[in-house]
Amino acid sequence: MASSSAPVHFGRYLSMFLVLFIGVYLLAFLTGDKRVVPRLGIDLQGGTRVTLTARTPDGSRPSREALSQAQQIISSRVNGLGVSGSEVVVDGDNLVITVPGNDGNEARNLGQTARLYIRPVLNSLPVQRGQDPKPGSPAGTLPNFAPMPPDHPGAQPRPYLQDPTSSPSSDPMPSPVPTGAALPGEVPSVEQPAPPDPRKDLAERIAEEKKWRQSTKQSIQFLALQFESTHCDKDDILAGNDDPNLPLATCSTDHNMAYLLAPSIISGDQIQNSTSGMNQRGVGYVVDLQFKSAAADVWADFTAAHIGTQTAFTLDSEVVSVPVINEAILGGRTQISGGDPPFTAATARQLANVLKYGSLPLSFEPSEAQTVSATLGLTSLRAGLIAGAIGLSLVLLYSLLYYRVLGLLTAFSLFCSGTIIFAILVLLGRYINYTLDLAGIAGLIIGIGTTADSFVVFFERIKDEIREGRSFRSAVPRGWVRARKTIVSGNAVTFLAAAVLHFLAIGQVKGFAFTLGLTTILDLVVVFLVTWPLVYLASKSPLLARPAYNGLGAVQQVARERRASAKTGRG
């Protein structure tokens, strides 16, 4: 047991909390959008809904298994970004994503197919906006394409998991032969044409796009590259549906360059992990990739054999990065840096997140964002806050009646805990997209109640020391030594329960568990850095040692009676 006579550096403890408090609020007021308001969930302020329509290369309906897998992957992406309170549901052949706030791009990005391929660059052209390639260019103007050697990694087809692609039939359907002429005066029956099938039409467009942009003929490849260089600002119908075993003519994400790429050498399913961070060799941010062992060997052999050449990283059929290989890259690690402009912290984190959880088994066409009204609204928020305020007031009233001045210290500690939790919630909403819903508010209220329990444990240990005959001044440090183990153990159990809920539960239960765990950690911070030093300072005051101020008169009376009984027994 620690000695009760050890020096107490109360000034150091209070200074540490003050630095933490000021630092958190400086970040809240001076960074980001500088709005010191927590990000509220869908149930309190509404959100944005985007419907993702599944599209398959052959025009068939998506399977339930593929939709369920896509739902799970998108849910993992949501959790990876820290976006709480979001909803991902299957609605027929569609996925409906609802996120808090009014940023529709966030919901669309969560539904990104994220099919990553690494392809060697064969040729490139700068984008020529406003110009169309002239049809019928003479063959003599074709550039000298680098021939693909037999040992090139892209020359041998590699197995990839992809949807089967069917080409539309080029043979027209035979016309029905009439069996007889219409009688005079009769109106010939005209068969109404069947309504066009949008899925079949889309499948035909994708198939035609593949024939044009993924041809193995050099002349067609050149025309496709020229065409792409003048149409990079158009929507890509092929997005996420390119065949990795064939060449590809496509554009960069910044729409400044068109590229002709060789077949893929590594696919995104060979990524073991992906993280984001600052670019140590330039500006902006990068995405760090760690390949699986088989892909790491392929990458090492390829980079060693192609020093000085360009290699493209394509995401959903667009080039996101075109690094030059300067040396052999061993260990299975590489980086993706953005184009012009470079990745920001948000875009790098988002790309790393979608690559970490894998590509979707389907490609989706997002709809326009729709505003969703709050399911509960600010009235429920106000009711929850009022309920919390009433409960907190009752706790403070009980503390003042039972502990007197120590109750005031309890109130001050709870104020410190509540204000720092508020600032942290603002920062979490700003940087990891955490949203506070009604379940999260319930977790906050219960967590603050746990903080009050810690004060009660401390004060009751002080009473136990006084019953044993010690003065208020000597009872405080001894009571703290006995109480802190109980406080740490109790908070550890609460935090463990919150952690289990957060990792195993879904939906709003995760928000409840998160705020409960957060307040549990801050409970320890406040008790150790605020409550304990303040109570120790109070024990040094002769005024606060009086029973009328500390509420310990009854306990001190019990101690005097015990001492008197002990003296009588010895006499």
Curated annotation (Swiss-Prot):
Disordered as annotated region, ranges: 124-199
Transmembrane region(s): 13-33, 383-403, 408-428, 439-459, 487-507, 512-532
UniProt keyword terms in alphabetical order: Cell membrane, Membrane, Protein transport, Translocation, Transmembrane, Transmembrane helix, Transport
Protein name: Protein translocase subunit SecD
Naturally occurring in which organism (per UniProt): Mycobacterium leprae (strain TN)
Family in the record: Belongs to the SecD/SecF family. SecD subfamily.
Function recorded in the entry: Part of the Sec protein translocase complex. Interacts with the SecYEG preprotein conducting channel. SecDF uses the proton motive force (PMF) to complete protein translocation after the ATP-dependent function of SecA.
Predominant location: membrane
Pfam families registered for this protein in UniProt: Sec_GG, SecD_1st, SecD_SecF_C, SecDF_P1_head
Compartments, record wording: Cell membrane
GO molecular function: protein-transporting ATPase activity
Keyword Membrane set for record: yes
Gene: secD
GO cellular component: plasma membrane
Subunit structure, as described in the record: Forms a complex with SecF. Part of the essential Sec protein translocation apparatus which comprises SecA, SecYEG and auxiliary proteins SecDF. Other proteins may also be involved.
Topological category with respect to the lipid bilayer: Multi-pass membrane protein
One of the protein's GO biological processes: protein transport by the Sec complex
PANTHER family: PROTEIN TRANSLOCASE SUBUNIT SECD, PROTEIN-EXPORT MEMBRANE PROTEIN SEC
InterPro entries registered for this protein in UniProt: SecD, SecD/SecF_arch_bac, SecD/SecF_CS, SecD_1st, SecD_SecF_C, SecD_SecF_C_bact, SecDF_P1_head
